[in-house]
Amino acid sequence: MRTTKGAARRQSKKRLFKRAKGFRGGRGNLTRTVKETLLRSGAFAFRDRRVRKREFRKLWIIRINAAVKQHGLRYSEFIHGLNKAGIQLDRKSLSEMAIHDAAGFKQVCDKVKETLAA
């Protein structure tokens, strides 16, 4: 008797189409197109996991710069002052502090100003 790929092929296609749920047109219905689209989406996902890190760092720096300008400093001066003062806060926590804890951020800025003046 001739054997076919029946069950195995069905499972394989089912797995593919499950991953392609929500894709429009042939990208969600046609096996070859689905495979190509999934490969491409995987490549984008891989790339963008790295891009995300860059984007967030940029956002934190922009926020810190805006907050620091209100206290009469520039971002580069502020970071230099932080390092000189030995304050080990990362950019993420500094940006959160600038948004949610203005008083605490002001204290950090004052400490940096003292360190830079000395």
Curated annotation (Swiss-Prot):
It comes from the Bacteria. Keywords: Ribonucleoprotein, Ribosomal protein, RNA-binding, rRNA-binding. GO terms for molecular function: rRNA binding; structural constituent of ribosome. It holds the Pfam family Ribosomal_L20. GO terms for cellular component: cytosolic large ribosomal subunit. Binds directly to 23S ribosomal RNA and is necessary for the in vitro assembly process of the 50S ribosomal subunit. It is not involved in the protein synthesizing functions of that subunit. SUPFAM superfamilies: Ribosomal protein L20. This is Large ribosomal subunit protein bL20. One of its GO terms (biological process) is ribosomal large subunit assembly. Belongs to the bacterial ribosomal protein bL20 family. It comes from Rhodopirellula baltica (strain DSM 10527 / NCIMB 13988 / SH1). NCBIfam families: rplT_bact (TIGR01032).
